[in-house]
Design a protein with these regions (language model features):
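Catalytic cores of nucleotide-sugar-dependent glycosyltransferases that transfer UDP/GDP/TDP-activated
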Residues: 1-380
Length: 380
């Protein structure tokens, strides 16, 4: 595509764990895929680094089998190897912006590489100590982006350049009002995701439940599945360990609702948004980012406990599934996310765009943060 007159030269460093786009798991990789695709469509000059088996146009510097080391004892060594390859490949090139998605290691290298006057970094995980302490050491030099207001609120003194909600791939098919009666939770099998509570809701609501996701590869994850999930599997509680592509899309679009009884403050729920853009409303506990993502009565219902979730399941017929999809697609499409990142690239900050009213504290923190200098397109 022909470059726009005001095109920026952008280097995007994706995580090294999964391909772009991911073939199954890989939420951060999906976001990077959607972002760089849309940036190129808009005429920007984009260089992307990622893992093997990625789409054309990605410089592949991480071995495919490294995905097995994610979160394991070799995690740090694999990430360091990948980042060394990335910055060797960059060489003496100059960019307007480096946008890092890899974590604090990649952010440090981007800041000290001198390859771009502006370094943008998306915080994809939970913003807790000691991560917040690290970010406070560099937040005046990097443009930090949070993926939700609730994530940013965990470190209210941290300078945040913008709240940019993640995007999902929009279904090609138009939303339909027809569906089946089952509930679905698409998530890793782990106590944090609350699948044991989803089972309780399904039983009490008289609805079949589908659990789709890999068992977390930890001792606690395996024990959780063996003790609290596996004994309840039956024709009314089905388990799909590997879902992706058309099978995943079909299961989501045919469900009466997605159910997410989360037991932690998840900074952003991609699976919830995937449900909503398909026209499938979401039932979720009020925690983390769920009040920002779900518009009660339009794209789903928020609940305080299991009893509330059961009651909400009885009101699903009140949701207009076509309207649910329309609202979600407008808010969480790739173009909207990309425009907000471009605002951060150019101006150094972007207006906060919450669905629910944020706390006065976080609004004050975000409103008083100064904009960073605007990068000028580099000569090519």
């Amino acid at each position: 595509m022909r470059a726009a007159p005001d095109a920026l030269r952008i280097a995007i460093v994706a995580p090294p764990w999964y391909s772009l786009p991911p073939k199954g798991y890989g939420g951060s990789e999906l976001v990077v895929h959607l972002l760089h695709t849309e940036l190129r469509r808009m005429g920007h000059d984009v260089t992307v680094f990622g893992a093997q088996d990625s789409e054309p146009g990605v410089t592949m510097l991480a071995d495919a089998e490294w995905s097995h080391d994610l979160g394991g004892p070799d995690h740090s060594a694999r990430l360091a190897t990948y980042l060394a390859r990335v910055y060797d490949a960059l060489g003496g090139q100059r960019f307007d912006v480096i946008h890092d998605h890899t974590g604090f290691e990649g952010l440090l290298l981007a800041l000290y590489s001198g390859a771009a006057p502006a370094v943008v970094h998306t915080i994809h995980g939970e913003l807790v100590e000691p991560m917040s302490t690290f970010y406070k050491e560099v937040h005046t030099r990097a443009r930090l982006c949070a993926i939700s207001l609730s994530q940013a609120a965990a470190a209210p003194t941290l300078r945040i350049a913008g709240i940019v909600h993640n995007a999902v791939e929009l279904p090609a098919a138009p939303p339909s009002s027809s569906h089946e009666r089952y509930l679905i939770e698409v998530a890793r099998i782990t106590p944090d995701k609350g699948q044991h509570l989803a089972i309780q809701v399904g039983q009490r609501a008289g609805r079949k439940l589908i659990l789709a996701g890999k068992v977390e590869r930890t001792r606690d994850g395996k024990r959780y599945f063996e003790e609290q999930i596996e004994p309840f599997l039956s024709p009314m509680v089905e388990y799909y360990p590997n879902v992706a592509g058309q099978q995943k899309a079909r299961l989501i679009s045919r469900a009466a609702a997605g159910i997410f009884p989360l037991q932690w403050s998840e900074p952003f729920g991609l699976a919830m948004v995937e449900c909503m853009v398909a026209g499938t409303p979401v039932l979720a506990l009020r925690t983390g980012s769920t009040p920002e993502l779900i518009e009660p009565g339009v794209t789903g219902f928020l609940a305080e406990d299991v009893e509330d979730l059961v009651e909400a399941a009885a009101r699903l017929d009140q949701i207009d599934r076509v309207r649910c999809a329309e609202v979600a697609r407008e808010r969480f499409g790739p173009h909207h996310m990309t425009e907000r990142y471009i605002s951060v690239y150019r101006r150094g900050s972007v207006e906060v765009e919450p669905l629910a009213a944020p706390s006065a504290e976080i609004v004050e923190v975000l409103s008083r943060q100064p904009a960073a200098p605007t990068p000028q397109p580099s000569g090519r």
